[in-house]
Amino acid sequence: MQDSDGNLYQPGYPTCAGNTQLTTAFGDCSYRYSAATDLLPQTRKISGMAEFTKALPANNQVQVQYFWSQSSATGYSGPMFYDFAMDPTSPYFPTGAGLICDGQVTCGTPLNLSGVNSTTGNAQPVNAIWTDPNNSRYGRDLNVEQRILLTFSGTNAGWDYSAALNYSKNHNDNSWTGGIPNEDVLAPNGVLSPLINPFGPQSAAGQALINSSYINGVYQLGLDTRWSVDLNASHPLGDAFDAGTPATVAFGGNASGETFRNWTTPYNDLTSAATGLSDSNVSGSRKIQAAFIELDVPVMKSLDFDVSDRQDRYSDFGTTNNAKVKVRWQPLDMLTVRGSASTGFRAPTLFNLYAPPFLSAASGGTMGDGNPYCQPGSYTAEWTQQTCAAQGIGLYGGNTKLNAETSQNFDLGVVIQPIENLGITLDYYRILLKNTVSRIPASAVYGDPNTFSNYIVTATSGQYAGTLPPTIAEASNCTPYTAPTCGYIIRQYANTGRITTDGFDLSVQYSQHTPIGTFREDLEGTAVTKFLEQQYDGGPLLNLVGNLRIVDLNPAFRWQHNVRVDWTSPNKMWGAGLGDRFYSGYVDEFPDGNGNLRHVGSYSLVDGYVSVKPIENLTVLFGIKNLFNTSPPYTNASQGNFASGYNALIADPLLRNFYINLRYTL
């Protein structure tokens, strides 16, 4: 609870009854959020494609293709947190007797249950901050995609050509299917019903009121469309250098358009405290015209140059020109040397630009270790240890002020074929990205509030950080006193600076034909030697090889690989295979208890399968993932999701699991 002076107390401590997920392990009534969150939502996908191809006279053809797909994801997330004023006549209104602060936290004194702030003299009711005892919210995301493609291709007067018309539409909706209340039922006019006990177990009447408050429905809809017209043609120019292969010129053009729209429904008015969405109806669009030309010139039998140039004109990001040069040299039959250099351009997506703003949890403590008010011995009635450690609130969504990403790319490699059926490629790559589009990490904002002061929105309020304000306006304008936990940090898309990375890609492929069948071995691996990244524009470039990336906490692995061994019987009726996915270890986000760097161990997963073709056109595959039931290595990283103790970006929390795949070809 929060008294009229903004001090925080836990009337239910140390019993912490009334919710099965409350624990006293940290010296207060803490909620185990991960235990009430579905880490692997149930997914379902149905898709189909129809294709018609007809040959036309003189080596031409027309093709029509239609694709339809429906996918859904259903799961549950942590419960609603409520923050309602209490009626002093409620039988559960605190009396002041026996009240203590949150564990070891020192609160302001004396306890003020008067309903009037002792500093300002303004009315300030006592607020009950509590968790839905039914624990989880249930939701569903539904996506329907349709695409139609019309293509003409063939040869005419020595020219190879293709022309395509494409139109696609993607419709999605987000809905709550359980655990979301109509707050007017629980707290008419913002005052908690006296039937509800926010500090302990519910009475039968209180539980019945909570159960009857839930409402289901679609709260947000989205629609994306895209159309494009593509024309491409190529023609041989002749063998001017007697290289044995004629030079070729290719050129083409493209015109496309896309739209984005996202809007909330009237149902969102009743559930905005759960979604963090204010009512919105946002949209955006763009048109693009592009033209390219490519010239492939063999200057001798062993040496080939390829030069291309592309110009794009965006209705919202202007004109850009990018070129690419490729060289291929084969001094020996068994050895090929290849390389390329290019520039690139990527405009922010319409979602990056126009996604609706919404409030949601931001990982990390409210103001982090960099805040002088959040140091031991510096706490006050407003900057308490509780409010400094509370999970903060972030404002998410699009940003129409984004700049486009640009890139420079270089690679140089060799292809070696020392014996028949064995191919080895080794390529060095170097990539430079500028104006990368991402989000500034919450940990960076909390850890250095002075540098990121423009990303912190404070307000004149005692709104508890762990409670999501119903609207952005309320998060920015609440009373009566100044506290850092009222407001939010800005987590909208931003240009976060530069990334420079280089390393090596290794590929080894080998096949063997034997009396018992054909064996194929394949290795695909990447070694990263440099990964420099800025966490904000103008910030220092940090070498993160073997560490967690700052922006998304995805490890920059020194080495990772996929190895596969497949076997096919001589009659092609049977098949089997094994695969290994390996990721090298890295430095964890937080040090150990002694302040030393903590390392996350390497991770290897072995998968296998057996397949059979019992009849023509039917293949049945039985597979096993994580054959050796390997547990993921422990990590203490705060990943911005609710996967606790393991890295959900690479690890499989299912451990050993089985699957079956049926494929029938008409």
Model-derived regions: residue spans:
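Transmembrane beta-strands of outer-membrane beta-barrel proteins
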Residues: 62-64, 161-163, 229, 247-253, ...
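Hydrophobic, lipid-facing positions within transmembrane beta-strands of outer-membrane proteins
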Residues: 46-50, 146-150, 225-231, 289-295, ...
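C-terminal beta-signal and adjacent terminal beta-strands/loops
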Residues: 423, 434-435, 529-532, 581-589, ...
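Surface-exposed, low-complexity loop segments enriched in small/polar and acidic residues
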Residues: 2-43, 49, 59-288, 316, ...
